[in-house]
Swiss-Prot record:
It comes from Saccharomyces cerevisiae (strain ATCC 204508 / S288c) (Baker's yeast). Its EC number is 3.6.5.2. This is GTP-binding protein RHO1. The keyword DNA repair does not apply. Alternates between an inactive form bound to GDP and an active form bound to GTP. Activated by the guanine nucleotide-exchange factors (GEFs) ROM1, ROM2 and TUS1, and inactivated by GTPase-activating proteins (GAPs) BAG7, BEM2, LRG1, and SAC7, and the Rho GDP-dissociation inhibitor RDI1. The different GAPs regulate RHO1 in a target-specific manner.
Amino acid sequence: MSQQVGNSIRRKLVIVGDGACGKTCLLIVFSKGQFPEVYVPTVFENYVADVEVDGRRVELALWDTAGQEDYDRLRPLSYPDSNVVLICFSIDLPDSLENVQEKWIAEVLHFCQGVPIILVGCKVDLRNDPQTIEQLRQEGQQPVTSQEGQSVADQIGATGYYECSAKTGYGVREVFEAATRASLMGKSKTNGKAKKNTTEKKKKKCVLL
């Protein structure tokens, strides 16, 4: 879907990850500027957003997907012609980060070989939330740390690792600006291979802009 129309460049972004990890909220907040208060499982909704990076205007087609296993056979229909893939997990659900390695990276590499991947930690506002911390403690877990997220990003060969909160708006624009830049870079030959840690620790991201 690498097209250029007039002064605008078209790119396709696909977002994947476990159900209820924050994918749809992230897209809605970015494209519509509002946070949905009611959770409704996704069944492939598409959005279009205009993004300007480095003086270039990009028409970014945002393809949402459902993370539930019931949709494992339908989800691959969203992958063709993708220019960048966001793999999301939720900071308050350590299992969702584990599934990035157990499920999502294999699926993405199979259907989108060479396409840039960005790992996104959603719901970062819950990392220091007392109720979330206590609930996870009772289950013998704790919120995912930035270091754990970055480590997985390195292991799966992601172009970058970002954290955000759709609820507060923190980091949302940075995620999509990084994704847009990655989509303009073209296909990568390093997906799936470990990379050196290029994290800018203060900014919690590792895309070289």
